[in-house]
Amino acid sequence: GNHATHNIRKEDEIIKVENDAVSSLEAAFAIIAAMSLGGVRKLEIEIGESAMVMGQGILGLFATQFCRLNGAYPVIAVDLNADRRNLALELGADYALDPRDADFPVKVKELTRGKGVSACVEVTGVSAALNQALECAAYMGRISLLGCTRVSDTVIDYYRQVHRPGIRLIGAHNFVRPKFESYPHHWTNRDDCLAILDLIAAKRILVSPIITKIASPAEAPALYKSLCEDEDFPIGVVFDWKKL
């Protein structure tokens, strides 16, 4: 956001939280959860299709829950961190795998009757993870590129991994969405946020387990420093502005 004490926003950019069942701390995650939901929508998941989410940070944990809500089975969560894998299981993943395992692609195939995953959300933005996603994809599978893969430091065999098996790579940047009217698989940011608030109120998606620290805004400098330097930085940190 801006380095300012006040922001002037357009009226249609403001979303009022009208349901008392949604706390202000939970509502704070609606915008980032909408990024995940947009990436999952573009996969057009059908009931019973397998799905995999590469990376279980905040975006990945929401994507995992949305894959499950879309009727995907099994939902496979992937992360290097054991705590994040366990949290993904708590939030509804059917399996959680470590991508460093030598037989990682084999395990994915075993969990999907030898086919590979039909739908995958790549959240990490690491090109090596995209390469692994391609190795695990089913024939004519889809991969949603939710993470920003800015550095192409891994060789991808586009004929063998993309062209020949008919894989669809889908750009899922949050800005690539309709501005005024939603349509199937492509909702406006506002409509996605409203849907997420409804799902939080109905306990269809869970936010509280993702919140690992509630901090005063006065702690911001130290927290941002830790974010840059600490590999084990908490997943979900929320500023409680009432603590000022």
Predicted regions and their residues:
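C-terminal capping/lid region of NAD(P)-dependent oxidoreductase domains
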Residues: 114, 144, 151, 155, ...
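Mid-domain Rossmann-like dinucleotide-binding core that forms the NAD(H)/NADP(H) cofactor-binding site
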Residues: 19-20, 25-102, 106
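Glycine-rich phosphate/adenylate-binding loop and adjacent beta-alpha elements
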Residues: 1-15
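C-terminal substrate-binding/catalytic core of Rossmann-like NAD(P)-dependent dehydrogenases/reductases
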Residues: 109-110, 157-211, 222
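Glycine-rich cofactor phosphate-binding loops and adjacent beta1-alpha1 units
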Residues: 43-45, 91-170
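Short, glycine/polar-rich helix-capping loops at beta-to-alpha or helix-loop-helix junctions
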Residues: 2-5, 79-87, 154-157
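Short beta-strand "acidic-cap" motif of Rossmann-like dinucleotide-binding folds
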Residues: 75-79, 145, 172
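Glycine/charged-rich beta-loop-alpha catalytic/anionic-binding loops adjacent to active sites
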Residues: 12-25, 115
